[in-house]
Amino acid sequence: MTKFTFATSKEGFDNHIDKSVRGYSHLWGDILNLSKYFVEDYTQVVDMGCSSGKLLKGMIEQNVKNIPHAQYTGIEIEEDFFGDYTHDENKYHQLNYFRGDVREFDFQNCSLVTSIFTLQFMSPKDRQEVINKIYKGLNTGGAFIFSEKTFSCNPRVQDMMTFMFYDYKRQHFTDKEILDKEVTLRHMMKPNTKTELYKMVQDAGFEIHTFWQNFNFVGIVALKK
């Protein structure tokens, strides 16, 4: 069996995610557009689990004219993504990458923190601790904009969402490719229900607003007031 790994899809990683999650390009575009309401000069913008760095580079290109003095940091632990980082850092003087574990990152003076499908790969204990760190590191008025896969607490609804999701993925992948990925992610990804996810974020002190949903995937703006 050929197992799915993030490394094997690295060359076309963003395209792979777009084919795997219906509406991903709209989610990505929404986060990019929302960033302009929060990025501020002389603050830090952080993308947690930045993979190829596409979102960070998009935010720089969108915001640099009006907000030229913001600094952008990508956090990534998967070494297979590191290859292009030095090139990116040379091209964008506002950009740097933290090549390591998000639990070791010091969130400070942040106007915006983003994360796309990252928390779901952490242990529940680490999720809460990281969310708490993000809240403390954000400036008042800042935001944590993130998206996660959730699961329904109703088994019937969960089955509906799962099979509709598989039907969508069959437009782009074979049954074997879908199964291989599921087998691999089963041991890595442990989603929350929406209720559990919202509670973790609210317990950290955030005010939350859902701005996007497709199947069991949600996008949330969490505000530090």
Question: Which positions does each model-derived feature cover?
Answer:
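Short conserved loop adjoining the S-adenosyl-L-methionine
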Residues: 104-108
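Core SAM-dependent methyltransferase catalytic element
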Residues: 204-225
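Class I SAM-dependent methyltransferase Rossmann-like catalytic core
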Residues: 2-28, 35-37
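C-terminal alpha-helical "lid/dimerization" subdomain adjacent to the S-adenosyl-L-methionine
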Residues: 149-200
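Conserved beta-strand signature within the Rossmann-like core of class I S-adenosyl-L-methionine
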Residues: 141-149
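Class I SAM-dependent methyltransferase SAM/SAH-binding core
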Residues: 46, 52-103
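A conserved beta-strand element that flanks and buttresses the S-adenosyl-L-methionine
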Residues: 114
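A short glycine-rich, Lys/Arg-flanked "PGG" loop and its adjoining helix->strand segment in the class I
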Residues: 128-140
